[in-house]
Design a protein with these regions (language model features):
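Family-specific signature for flavin-dependent thymidylate synthase
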Residues: 1-202
Length: 205
């Protein structure tokens, strides 16, 4: 393959699409930094989150007191969101009807306007769904950065699952994929996790 000779551009013609759900808006902010990709994300503007779901970090899950405080906060956020959406919808509906718009049409428009502003109180833990398409070269870069032990836990777990899906499909492309320490020295220097041997045992070389 040309990629064996140091030419990576040919693998840009191979693309992979992933359906991703049950991840937080925190992860969304990180994954969209990878610019050579296409994203379709569940809208909080047009979809009212009556069924408020959220991601609980493992470190919070592991400490009962922290978990209780986190769950209470999520319940409060959910109620504030729904209360605010309701107040905004009622206010917008009254204004639009006062301007002569029929009630059914006014309420439909008011609902969208309410969702647009009510979402500002939603936490980063709020779940979202997305479809992501990346070419193979971008995926190699993504795996190098996000499979690293120093990557944030949620996006690292996602990267590992994505790698597990694409490797069986195209092992000739992804045989050297993974964190940078798979194919060379760790680039983190003093910040190295010190678990290179463990990483190498988990990632196919």
């Amino acid at each position: 393959m040309l990629s064996d000779l140091g030419h990576a551009s040919p693998i840009e013609h191979a693309s992979f699409t992933f359906g991703i759900e049950g991840v937080s808006r925190t992860l969304l902010a990180q994954i969209t930094r990878h610019r050579i990709a296409s994203f379709s994300v569940q809208s909080q503007r047009y979809v009212r989150l009556d069924d408020f779901r959220y991601v609980t970090p493992p470190e919070i899950e592991a400490i009962p007191e922290a978990k209780a405080a986190f769950l209470a906060s999520m319940e409060e956020d959910a109620q504030r969101y729904l209360d605010l959406a309701h107040k905004l919808e009622e206010g917008h509906t009254a204004r639009l009807m006062g301007e002569g718009m029929p009630e059914k049409q006014a309420r439909a428009k008011a609902s969208k306007q309410a969702n647009e502003d009510a979402r500002f109180v939603l936490p980063n833990a709020c779940e979202t769904k997305m479809v992501v398409t990346m070419n193979a070269r971008s995926l190699m870069n993504f795996f190098q950065l996000r499979c690293c032990n120093r990557a944030q836990w949620e996006i690292r777990e996602l990267a590992e699952k994505m790698f597990a899906l694409v490797y069986p499909v195209a092992p000739h492309i992804f045989r050297t994929a993974g964190p940078a320490c798979v194919s060379g020295p760790c680039p983190e220097g003093k910040m190295c996790c010190g678990r290179t041997t463990e990483v190498l045992s988990l990632i196919h070389i």
